[in-house]
């Protein structure tokens, strides 16, 4: 058995054991781990459930993130899956297909507890009042494990893609091209370890 499939099977067994040992009727799996390395959505791998399963059989680590294994295991065991990080796991058609097949919901796309939460609060105020925007600078200073993980460029890229898309989804440049088409948007996360 390939490593990814072995990982999925172990996760499925862990879910079954947890459910039995704790006498649970239902389980909801919530991903609240650190941000993973950015995995762009690839149609040939993520476009269908069959393609995703083939990539897992081939142990395609470039396209199969750990959270995808967790989501796959959860849905396969009849558990809803909630994504608490900006990973692409719940953005792929293959996962939607599995959710539909198992009749289990998938939800979430980052808990947005820091700069994105603030941005999500202020951007609608700017948009509603038709205030122009020339730039937006976002920063987080993190001294915890998240900061350490996000100090790695590949992990930061996942967070950056999520954070950059927030303004565009709220301000909708197509609706107000004179106000929101040509603004500068910079996202930074700084790791500052505690002494």
Model-derived regions: residue spans:
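Active-site-lining helix/loop region of Rossmann-like oxidoreductase modules
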Residues: 97, 102-104, 111, 115-195
């Amino acid at each position: 058995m390939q490593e990814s499939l072995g990982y999925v099977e172990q996760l499925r067994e862990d879910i079954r054991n947890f459910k039995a040992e704790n006498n649970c009727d239902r389980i909801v799996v919530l991903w609240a781990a650190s941000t993973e390395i950015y995995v762009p959505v690839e149609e040939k791998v993520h476009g269908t459930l069959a393609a995703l399963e083939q990539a897992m059989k081939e142990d395609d680590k470039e396209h199969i993130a750990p959270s995808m294994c967790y989501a796959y295991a959860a849905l396969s065991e009849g558990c809803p899956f909630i994504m608490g990080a900006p990973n692409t796991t719940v953005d792929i058609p293959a996962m939607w297909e599995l959710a539909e097949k198992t009749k289990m919901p998938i939800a979430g796309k980052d808990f947005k507890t820091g700069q994105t939460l603030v941005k999500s609060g202020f951007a609608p105020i700017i948009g509603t009042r038709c205030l122009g925007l020339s730039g937006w600078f976002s920063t987080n200073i993190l001294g915890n494990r998240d900061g350490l993980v996000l100090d790695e460029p590949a992990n930061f890229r996942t967070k950056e893609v999520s954070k950059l898309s927030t303004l565009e989804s709220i301000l909708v440049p197509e609706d107000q091209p004179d106000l929101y088409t040509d603004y500068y948007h910079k996202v930074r996360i700084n790791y500052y370890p505690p002494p």
